[in-house]
Amino acid sequence: MEKKLCIAIDGPAAAGKSTVAKIVARKKSYIYIDTGAMYRAITYLALEKGVDLNDEAALTALLKESAIDLTVSPEGEQKVYIAGEDVTEAIRTDSVSNQVSIVAKYAGIREEMTKRQQQLAEKGGVVMDGRDIGTHVLPNAEVKIFLLASVEERAKRRFEENVKKGYNVNYETLAEEIRRRDKLDSEREISPLKKADDALEIDTTSLTIDEVAEKILQIVDKKAQK
């Protein structure tokens, strides 16, 4: 019987992590855990409730009293709920995207999120994507992938995503925002964006999503047979 693995996929904003992770999870019949959506959810909630994003204690208290649930719809789409309310679309707005790196830098927030994420992965058979999965959340994951792509390519992808959703955001603004998030994510003190020593690096700039997923699936299949 094939072993159920833990797969960690890390990388900067808009490198294609979530899209690839969903494909890999679907093909392997694994559970997909979008850690970025969890951080987005608490950022959205804080903005909705008017909590000061510079107040780590208030944000951590808000997270500890809030149930964040990730489910999969019958159509295979991930849904995000806060206390039973569907916030799947609401957490993808620019206001949340622009603030999530601020909320995610706090030790109290990351500690609570890490605990929840590790509980979700206890039995294996999971694909988890984020910034610090291979280095911090699942340091013993059997497969660790670090996705890269140029800022220009990532801004292009985000721009195309926004056009599909009907959002009107300038390409240059998106590129600048991605550079800012890269800086915040890689320079934060707690669990910064960093490639794990034993992670396999894949540059996705000139690859399609399916090509990236296929590369990862080959690695997973090889590991699962060992």
Curated annotation (Swiss-Prot):
InterPro entries: Cytidylate_kin (IPR003136), Cytidylate_kinase_dom (IPR011994), P-loop_NTPase (IPR027417). It comes from Bacillus licheniformis (strain ATCC 14580 / DSM 13 / JCM 2505 / CCUG 7422 / NBRC 12200 / NCIMB 9375 / NCTC 10341 / NRRL NRS-1264 / Gibson 46). Its main location: cytoplasm. It comes from the Bacteria. The gene is cmk. Its EC number is 2.7.4.25. GO terms for molecular function: ATP binding; CMP kinase activity; dCMP kinase activity. This is Cytidylate kinase. It holds the Pfam family Cytidylate_kin.
